[in-house]
Amino acid sequence: MSDFTLDFAEGDAADTVSPQITSKSLCTPGCITGWMMCNTVTKGCSFTIGK
């Protein structure tokens, strides 16, 4: 079972389609990485950007 729902929805224009990506993870709802970025201290997404 995937952590993401990759659903497509029609846009405002007749010929356009836009993806609707949502996380199913309970720890990080809406986080694009799902449970892999689960941070139990902040209860949300956490990203580390380094060189």
From Swiss-Prot:
GO MF entries: signaling receptor binding
Cross-link (Beta-methyllanthionine (Thr-Cys)): T28-C31, T33-C38, T42-C45
Crosslink position(s): Lanthionine (Ser-Cys): S23-C27
Activity regulation text: Antimicrobial activity depends on the dehydration degree and integrity of flavucin.
Any one GO BP annotation for this protein: defense response to bacterium
Pfam family for this entry, one: Gallidermin
Disulphides: none
Keyword Electron transport: no
GO CC terms: extracellular region
The keyword ATP-binding is assigned to this record: no
Keywords: Antibiotic, Antimicrobial, Bacteriocin, Lantibiotic, Thioether bond
Record-linked InterPro entries: Lantibiotic_typ-A_Bacillales
Positions of the pro-segment in this chain: 1-20
PTM comment text: Maturation of lantibiotics involves the enzymatic conversion of Thr, and Ser into dehydrated AA and the formation of thioether bonds with cysteine. This is followed by membrane translocation and cleavage of the modified precursor.
Family named by the database record: Belongs to the type A lantibiotic family.
Known function: Lanthionine-containing peptide antibiotic (lantibiotic) active on certain Gram-positive bacteria. The bactericidal activity of lantibiotics is based on depolarization of energized bacterial cytoplasmic membranes, initiated by the formation of aqueous transmembrane pores. Flavucin has high antimicrobial activity against several pathogenic bacteria such as S.aureus, E.faecalis, E.faecium and L.monocytogenes. Is also active against the Gram-negative P.aeruginosa.
More about this protein: A heterologous expression system was used to produce flavucin. The gene has been fused to the leader peptide gene sequence of the model lantibiotic nisin. The construct was plugged into the nisin expression and modification machinery, and produced in L.lactis. Growth conditions that yield detectable antimicrobial activity in C.lipophiloflavum could not be identified.
Designated name of the protein: Lantibiotic flavucin
Species whose genome carries this gene: Corynebacterium lipophiloflavum (strain ATCC 700352 / DSM 44291 / CCUG 37336 / JCM 10383 / DMMZ 1944)
Encoding gene, per UniProt annotation: flaA
